[in-house]
Amino acid sequence: MVKHQPLQVYERQLCLSCLTGIYGCRWKRYQRSHDDSSKWECSWFFILCCSFLLLLVWSYFWLEAHNDYNEFNWLLYNRSAIWKDGTVPILAATLTGFTYTAFLMILALCHIVLGQQLNLYWIHKIVVLAILLTTITGVVFIDDFWQDEWDIVIISLQFTGPFLHIGALAVVTALGWVIAGQVVRVERSSDLLLVLYLVPLFISSPCIMDRSKLGPRPAVIGRRGAPMLAPEHTIMSFSKALQQKVTALEADVTISLDGVPFLMRDRTLRRTTNVDKLFPARQDHDASFFNWTEIRSLSAGLWFLRDDPYWTVQYMSEKDRNRTANQTVCSLAELLRLAARTNRSVIFSLRQPPHQHPHHQLWVSDALKAIQRSSILPEQVMWTPDWYRKKVRAAVPLLQQTSDEKLPVAELKERGISTLTLHYSQARAQDIRQFSGSNVSINVYPVNEPWLYSLMWCSGVQSVSSDAPHILKKVPNPVWIMSADEYGLIWITSDLISVAIVIGIFIFQKCDTQWKMSGMRSYNPEQIMLSAVVHRPSRDVNLMKEKLIFSEINNGVGSTDELSGYTGNGLDTYSRDDIMTPARHATKL
């Protein structure tokens, strides 16, 4: 039996095989290459980087837009007339795409570090291109459908900017090995590091301030009660808000067909009542064309248990679920009585009925009558509508005049307005300080996230309207606040550490490159051994080597005819019999 022994033994490289196999389906050793990547593959790497960066921004947008998820779903409902949580498929697709591209990015960077040729598998190329096109489509859709929400990105950077800078610095420093290998050849790559080191010069945040200048904690107003804990605009919702220590209650008021002010946000009753069961032919009619008796007969809680708009029903007790199912539409008079009994203020917006409505011209007086007939003090009511404001002030002088229009201070004083209710995108720190200095209070809406509440707190607002008073109740202090000196120290320290690490990597890379180049100059092909593993010499191995030598002689320069030409030049020639092989040497001995 002939014993066969491999001439060349390779070291197993399972990790490298997995790396190149998953990225480019190159599982075999002979498929891998250390050659420079082709321009085509470099182009696909660029597309992969673009997809990853776009998804990074897209993910950040949806992370910060969590404050307004309900607003997004409400806009979808107004367009489709069907209530659904549209954020779930978007978040699932975004998370999947980001995870996929991030994984491919890591594999690509590992290829670069190990000097492997980039060769993205064709299936990956199709998926990456599909992800890129889908994300671009999503960005265009949001820009058309929800354009105002882009402001949340700019505002959130005031809060997250210092930490994003440190995170980006850490990532670039961690990738210093790859960057250093490029900077050795292309010095302009160092511009990226220089920009990162100087970014804090352009970062400004209201939370970078002395703690002694921090104002009092902003009061929290229950916007439509506590709609995450109970159906919006119901007595149960306002009661839940009062349990969270809110200072005021906010509502949207509509006038019924018989002149009764009641609480309703939507134009129709379809979303928040069972009007489709009791009045199916009128479910798309304007809510103001129902009389109070019809409105009172509707359930205002079953929809909450069915749709679960905030994913909170599973945490409700059985008692609260039964109570929710029995909720009815709340009138303005009921809200005023509840506020008077608990010594809370009330702020509401008033919607004018359509032209065909019998109370189209009487809607303001209907609301004033409800206020005057209740037991609430006039100074506890914050009047927002701009219509007939002078007549309202004359009829009830003690009402707190509030406006949702950002006007100059002089004009606000002329109208007798003492409080501004602004969207958070309009609440700039400089304007807030200006209004506060003129004794004009600022109320900001909607504020549902601790980070946004902290930002408004540091900006100096007096109150915020929130759908989540139970969450803001757990924020006794701003999430973070630091002085300019503290931030400067953190900035300089992190930059110095990064510079030291990157310089160390650069020096090591340069020395390593020079060492390899010096090794190339002393390279001798004869030093290459046929076997990577040392084995004890055997007769079989010697015979195999002898056969290889003779085959090379017969196929190449070893023929007698070719070698005979060199004898005239004084060069020695050898015949096959003159070659002393290890086997012949052993036989001779």
Feature names for model-found ranges:
Residues M1-L589:
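Phosphate-group recognition and catalysis centered on beta-loop-alpha active-site segments
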